[in-house]
Design a protein with these regions (language model features):
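Short loop->beta-strand "edge-of-pocket" segments that line small-molecule binding or catalytic clefts
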Residues: 147
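N-terminal amphipathic/hydrophobic targeting modules at extreme N-termini
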Residues: 1-2
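Active-site-proximal loop/helix segments of hydrolase catalytic cores
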Residues: 150-155
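A metal-dependent hydrolase metal-coordination microenvironment
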Residues: 17, 27, 32-140, 144
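Aromatic (phenylalanine/tyrosine) cluster motif
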Residues: 5-9, 14
Length: 155
C-alpha cells in the first residue's frame, strides 16, 4: 500500500472514530493541502456478491453512491473479497471510471468481533477469507504484510 493510501486510510479510520465520539455536526473541517482533492468515501460497504447481508449488486451500489456525491468506496464484505473481485473483473474498465473502489474485508475474529482489514493490493492472503482467528494473530498477520485494520463497529 503506498504511503498516500496508508495515510488516507489511517486518517479515514481516525475520522470515523472522531465522528462517533463527537457526532457528525461537531467534527472539525478537513484541511486540504495544495494539489490534493478531498474525496467522499463510504468506508464500510457490503455487496450482494460478497456478503450474506449485502442486498445490492456492486454496480447498483456504485451508481447510488455517485448519485449521493461519493467519490469512492471501500468494499468490506464479510470474510470475502467476492464483491471486490466482481468489480475488478466485470466493471472496473467499463463504467464508473472516475469512481475509486478499494479492497477491504470485514473479518470475524473469535475474540473481538468484526475487524475491518485493508491490505496492499499485491498481497493475497487466503487466510483472511477464513473466519475465526484470535484478534492478536490477525493484527500480527496484517501488520507483517503492510496492511491496516480497525474496528468495524466502534460503538
Amino acid at each position: 500500500m503506498s504511503e498516500t493510501y496508508r495515510h488516507f486510510f489511517v486518517k479515514a479510520l481516525y475520522d470515523m472514530r472522531e465522528s462517533v465520539i463527537l457526532g457528525m455536526d461537531q467534527r472539525r473541517k478537513p484541511q486540504e493541502k495544495e494539489g490534493t482533492k478531498q474525496m467522499k468515501f463510504d468506508m464500510h460497504c457490503h455487496t450482494k456478491e460478497g456478503s450474506m447481508d449485502g442486498k445490492v449488486p456492486i454496480d447498483d451500489f456504485i451508481a447510488e453512491l455517485i448519485r449521493k456525491g461519493f467519490n469512492g468506496m471501500l468494499v468490506t464484505d464479510h470474510n470475502s473479497y467476492n464483491g471486490y473481485r466482481t468489480w475488478k473483473r466485470n466493471i472496473k474498465d467499463q463504467k464508473f471510471k472516475d469512481f475509486v473502489v478499494l479492497k477491504g474485508i470485514e473479518y470475524d475474529t473469535i475474540d473481538a468481533g468484526h475487524i475491518l482489514v485493508i491490505m496492499p493490493e499485491t498481497i493475497k492472503l487466503k487466510i483472511l477469507e477464513l473466519r475465526g482467528l484470535p484478534v492478536q494473530i490477525l493484527i500480527d498477520i496484517v501488520h507483517k504484510n503492510g496492511g491496516i485494520l480497525g474496528p468495524a463497529h466502534p460503538c
